[in-house]
Amino acid sequence: LRDFSQTYYKAELKNPNFFVRAYMSETDDGDSYNMTALGLLTTQALAPTYIGTYAGALLPKILTGQTVTDADKAAAQAAAYAAVQPGAGTNLAEDQLKAVREGLFQRGGAGFIDNSRLYHTEFNYNFGHLIDFAEIQVGGNFRRYDLFSDGTVFNENQGNGTYERIEIDEFGFYTQISKKFDRLKATASIRYDKNENFDGQVTPRASLVYSAGKDREHNFRASFQTGFRNPDTQAQFIFFPSTSGILLGSTRAN
């Protein structure tokens, strides 16, 4: 990461009975690049036959009884001789390194772009001051992921040479009720969450807390809860070729 930054903004309104808050974050990739791609592409440009020459020299030396260390040293030396040799007074290696670093990944370079944003709003309201028999709360949230990497990380390619931002929306809402019975406190809640790329999820929870002792200093708790996790944005929309294969997001839209 080089000159990479993330900026956060937040606004909040609250009192003892409710809160509403909103925040956003935005990413600036600066001059960041993929180091693996930088090394590989620079080597391929300066020594296109390096791997073949190295492998061709290594195996025969091992088969003739040389140690792996000696064979590796000799093979690396042979491959280095096969590399493009810069002329006197030139900076071929530095120039090639700079060109690859400034080019975009998946288009002959190692640089990547991340100009993504996140928008999130949430609220909660407690009806405790209006209802006597129990404490009831309701709340919810909305979130938007606004992704853009110009095709260097996410699969924004529209198939016609253009790259468009990817937007993912999700929302959720919940209600919770709590009731005290002398030494016992019972709480139950239910929540619904929906991401546009996945089925909605219902997650109920319940708990009982019993306070024992003269001063109620001993608490015993029993609870039941459920949860889930949707894949993150990269797991949904990544498209990332590597030397071992292609990392591909799992959503249908990808």
List the model feature ranges, each with a label:
Residues 2, 146, 169, 226, ...:
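Flexible, active-site-adjacent loop/turn segments at secondary-structure boundaries
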Residues 23, 205-207:
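A structural signal for beta-strand register positions
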Residues 30-35, 196-201, 210-254:
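Surface-exposed extracellular loop regions of Gram-negative outer-membrane beta-barrel proteins
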Residues 174, 203-205:
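One-face residue pattern on beta-strands with alternating periodicity enriched for small/polar residues
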Residues 10-157, 163-198:
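Face-selective signature of the C-terminal outer-membrane beta-barrel domain
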